[in-house]
């Protein structure tokens, strides 16, 4: 019971509350979906170290298999670099820029809708309050009766929609800002990893046959 009314009566008497209910369901759905996507497509420094260890040993096939097994934006960036490692650094940088932009779009998917729901829920709550106040004063004018207690009750019922709208809007806005910042941070991290990969690939291309032979000998020595 809220203000002497059941939830059914509250939603039955206010179309704005019904709209807010649907908004809350939509917002919760988007938050859960984005949380799952970010968790599934996270970045790990362990993966970066492991991949670059393959490059240091000159194990291209091992690096390719490892990158393909990641099934993440990091793995897709690594594969793109390996498949185009013979390109000039500037060309490879442009490829990485396009790939990272594509990944960022995926991370930011549905965030526009989440932001709209956060602001829309608050405004809907205010609309419900205004409509409720109009109805309360209109009923008082028609009946010709109503003391402070009656007016206060009508205002309290009208303000309920504002409270519900804020209850939806504030958490949704928090998650919107969190996911937006997270998407930006991941994009910057991918850019940094991409730069490191370009340097590593270019360094391997500059090795002379004699240097490659010495590296193979060192690898065999340590394996022994």
Predicted regions and their residues:
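Predominantly long cytosolic amphipathic alpha-helical stalk/bundle segments
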Residues: 42-127, 131-145, 177-224
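Hydrophobic alpha-helical transmembrane segments of polytopic membrane proteins
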Residues: 156-174
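Hydrophobic membrane-targeting segments
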Residues: 1-49
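Lipid-exposed faces of alpha-helical membrane segments in multi-pass integral membrane proteins
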Residues: 19-32, 117, 121-127, 164, ...
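Hydrophobic membrane-targeting alpha-helices
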Residues: 31-34, 139, 175
């Amino acid at each position: 019971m809220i203000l002497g009314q059941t939830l059914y009566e509250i939603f039955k008497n206010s179309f704005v509350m019904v709209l807010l209910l649907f908004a809350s369901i939509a917002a919760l759905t988007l938050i859960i979906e984005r949380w799952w996507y970010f968790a599934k497509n996270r970045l790990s420094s362990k993966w970066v170290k492991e991949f670059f260890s393959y490059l240091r040993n000159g194990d291209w096939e091992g690096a390719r298999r490892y990158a393909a097994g990641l099934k993440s934006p990091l793995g897709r960036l690594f594969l793109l670099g390996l498949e185009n490692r013979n390109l000039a650094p500037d060309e490879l940088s442009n490829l990485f820029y396009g790939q990272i932009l594509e990944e960022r779009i995926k991370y930011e998917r549905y965030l526009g809708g989440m932001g709209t729901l956060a602001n829309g829920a608050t405004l809907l709550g205010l609309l419900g309050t205004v409509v409720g106040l109009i109805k309360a004063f209109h009923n008082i004018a028609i009946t010709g009766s109503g003391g402070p207690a009656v007016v206060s009750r009508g205002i309290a019922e009208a303000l309920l929609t504002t409270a519900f709208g804020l209850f939806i809007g504030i958490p949704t806005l928090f998650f919107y800002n969190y996911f937006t910042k997270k998407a930006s941070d991941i994009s910057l991290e991918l850019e940094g990893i991409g730069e490191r990969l370009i340097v590593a690939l270019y360094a391997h291309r500059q090795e002379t046959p004699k240097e490659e032979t010495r590296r193979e000998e060192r690898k065999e020595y340590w394996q022994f």
